[in-house]
Amino acid sequence: MKSSLACVVLCSLVAVGCAFKSGAPQRQCEAMRPYHEGSEPQTGRAPYTISFSKNKIAPGERISVKITGEGNERFKGFMIQARVGDTPVGKFSSSNSIKLLDCSGTSNTATHTSNTPRSRVNLFWTAPKDLTETVTFKYTIVKDYVTYWVAHDSPKLTIA
């Protein structure tokens, strides 16, 4: 009995240890998946939205990007990239509550710095000066350890 209890406790600690409480690590740049032990990503629509301060911007322009939970929906973690195809582009600006990652470019990915539940995150993103394309923001949202949505697409943002 004692060994069974010890095994359960140890397995619980290992599973919790795999969570990214202070933001996604750089090795998650491509897949954008948390790989929480014993869980799979949600397949339905995420109860979170991505919105922009503008739907069309000029090359080199900075916009605000907001991740918001619908209703009272809260989340503990996130990871977001602006992409052209599979390539992260642009640059996020830093703040105390956001960790920036270099995923094949400087500061082109943003993630959380703590797993404190929140209902929204405000970010700033700057388009590359030489880019005139349509960009899609890919985002992963973690509601809790077993409930998360991976690499969902935002509405398109035109850079022209």
Enumerate the language-model features and the residues they cover.
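Long, disordered, Ser/Thr/Pro-rich
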Residues: 1-160
